Amino acid sequence: IRALPWDNPAFVAPVLGLLGFIPGGAGGIVNASFTLDYVVHNTAWVPGHFHLQVASLVTLTAMGSLYWLLPNLTGKPISDAQRRLGLAVVWLWFLGMMIMAVGLHWAG
């Protein structure tokens, strides 16, 4: 695990997205259960689950894809400042989505 490129936003973004997908998938089991869905339907639980799924996995994977794609399309590697900014954006997005989703689940 230490040998993985943790300083590359193109790697970190989808990994964090997958980490957010784990509790989102557990919430999907709740939504799929008729008895539990009856309790959480039309509450803040549902948007909390949606944001864990879409905002964590899909958006972070798109961010990571762009951090890989743009340097390859332009032929210019990203600078150290851009790499650090990319890591900050990815981590802040992930933490913000986790805080928001936990709040929505708690309220639901």
Curated annotation (Swiss-Prot):
Membrane topology annotation: Multi-pass membrane protein
Entry annotated with the keyword Chaperone: no
Binding site for heme a3: 49
InterPro entries, alphabetized: Cyt_c_oxase-like_su1_dom, Cyt_c_oxase-like_su1_sf, Cyt_C_Oxase_1
Pathway, per record: Energy metabolism; oxidative phosphorylation
Keywords: Cell membrane, Copper, Electron transport, Heme, Hydrogen ion transport, Ion transport, Iron, Membrane, Metal-binding, Respiratory chain, Translocase, Transmembrane, Transmembrane helix, Transport
TM region(s), chain numbering: 10-30, 50-70, 85-105
Reactions catalysed: 4 Fe(II)-[cytochrome c] + O2 + 8 H(+)(in) = 4 Fe(III)-[cytochrome c] + 2 H2O + 4 H(+)(out)
Subcellular location field: Cell membrane
GO biological process: oxidative phosphorylation
Enzyme Commission number(s) from the entry: 7.1.1.9
UniProt GO molecular function: cytochrome-c oxidase activity; heme binding; metal ion binding
Span of the signal peptide: none
Free-text comment on the cofactor: Binds 2 heme groups.
One GO cellular component term: plasma membrane
Cofactor: heme; Cu cation
Residues given in the record as Fe(II)-heme a binding sites: 51
Classification via PANTHER family: CYTOCHROME C OXIDASE SUBUNIT 1, CYTOCHROME C OXIDASE SUBUNIT I
Family from the record: Belongs to the heme-copper respiratory oxidase family.
Protein name per the record: Cytochrome c oxidase subunit 1
